[in-house]
Amino acid sequence: MKGQQKTAETEEGTVQIQEGAVATGEDPTSVAIASIQSAATFPDPNVKYVFRTENGGQVMYRVIQVSEGQLDGQTEGTGAISGYPATQSMTQAVIQGAFTSDDTVDTEGTAAETHYTYFPSTAVGDGAGGTTSGSTAAVVTTQGSEALLGQATPPGTGQFFVMMSPQEVLQGGSQRSIAPRTHPYSPKSAAPRTTRDEKRRAQHNEVERRRRDKINNWIVQLSKIIPDCSMESTKSGQSKGGILSKACDYIQELRQSNHRLSEELQGLDQLQLDNDVLRQQVEDLKNKNLLLRAQLRHHGLEVVIKNDSN
């Protein structure tokens, strides 16, 4: 947003600018900052000043003072500036309005034109056109900001304002130090994509080749173990699928044989138990037979055992 203000010279010889109004175009919604008080305008018709906003934000400026003695003693191309304390600073909010091409002010002038910049304070008043009571808005003039940047401010002259971005203010003539990088920047020198792809493809092919070799070796081992599936038949045209199929059949046959053998083994164990019981019974009967024979001899009876050949 761009606005225009009028100035008035006080009795103390300090050049001050009263609260101004916003120049509006065809947009009726543009809101004025404050009413213009009757005062003499700038004697120089080339004097221009603008409100500059970034990203549609609010304009903030600080109350400063330009002494008459400093203005009389300065040469063309320089400007002496002193600042008020932070407690005397004021804020003013500016509402953005639409401007036509006729209302715009050309801010890019020659080196002889005087430009004005409003510097921000720490707070912004609520509402459009809200100002702090009893404070006035002052303007900073400059003719050559590049020349002022290289000069140090004499002691006791207060703050030093630079005509650039409102956030960039150098105090006491000291230069602002730039924070170093946390880590040095190293540009990436990546190899061409084709070389990277070829390397990845070659590595993938090598892995696949090793995997195929392992599978082939395992199939050869199976062909040696499975009956009727020797290397000769494999070389004569036996496919890998046929070898694997025979391996599956052979494994199924082995499982069935193992199950059958386990059942037969359980039957043998049962027969062994039965045989042990029968053997014990035979031993008991033999002992009883011997006792009976002894009793018969004791009573004078002779026992004759006849073997029937029939």
Curated annotation (Swiss-Prot):
Composition skew (Polar residues), residue ranges: 1-17
Pfam families membership: HLH
GO BP terms in the entry: positive regulation of transcription by RNA polymerase II
Subcellular locations according to the entry: Nucleus
GO terms assigned for molecular function: DNA-binding transcription factor activity, RNA polymerase II-specific; protein dimerization activity; RNA polymerase II cis-regulatory region sequence-specific DNA binding
GO CC, one annotated term: nucleus
Residue intervals of the bHLH domain: 199-254
Annotated SUPFAM superfamilies: HLH, helix-loop-helix DNA-binding domain
Keyword hit for Cell wall biogenesis/degradation: no
Covalent cross-link (Glycyl lysine isopeptide (Lys-Gly) (interchain with G-Cter in SUMO2)), residues: 306
Superkingdom of origin organism: Eukaryota
Basic and acidic residues: bias regions: 194-209
Region ranges (Leucine-zipper): 271-292
Region (Disordered): 1-26, 171-209
Function: Transcription factor that binds to a symmetrical DNA sequence (E-boxes) (5'-CACGTG-3') that is found in a variety of viral and cellular promoters. Regulates the expression of the surfactant protein-A (SP-A) gene.
Subunit structure: Efficient DNA binding requires dimerization with another bHLH protein. Binds DNA as a homodimer or a heterodimer (USF1/USF2).
Protein name in UniProt: Upstream stimulatory factor 1
Organism: Oryctolagus cuniculus
